[in-house]
């Protein structure tokens, strides 16, 4: 398809998925426990970061330019009140220690 057609498809898909994405984001941010991780992603030669926040029933994804605390907050919200299970990357250090669990697989490495 032509570039304009591809752009239109992307815009239509984004519009169609806006409400379901918002529902998943709300559910994930309200969860009592989250598993969060990020991984590098090459996008047209530029480094990006794919973030994921998972619960037993839903996973929220966000692709961004940064791998820092602010990027994490954009995913889970600034005031996430539940238990966060993560690796030991410093972006997660701002979460209260009494509500943070380090992933067992990362502890074993």
Q: Model features per residue range: what roles?
A:
Residues 1-109:
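Catalytic center-proximal scaffold of phosphoryl-transfer enzymes
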């Amino acid at each position: 398809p032509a570039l304009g057609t591809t752009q239109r498809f992307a815009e239509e898909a984004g519009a169609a998925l806006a409400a379901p994405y918002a529902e998943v984001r709300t559910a994930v941010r309200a969860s009592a426990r989250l598993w969060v991780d990020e991984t590098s992603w090459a996008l047209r030669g530029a480094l990006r970061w794919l973030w994921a926040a998972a619960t037993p029933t839903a996973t929220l994804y966000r692709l961004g330019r940064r791998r820092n605390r602010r990027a994490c907050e954009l995913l889970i919200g600034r005031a996430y009140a539940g238990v966060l299970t993560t690796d030991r990357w410093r972006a997660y250090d701002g979460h209260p220690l009494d509500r943070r669990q380090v992933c067992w697989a990362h502890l074993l490495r």
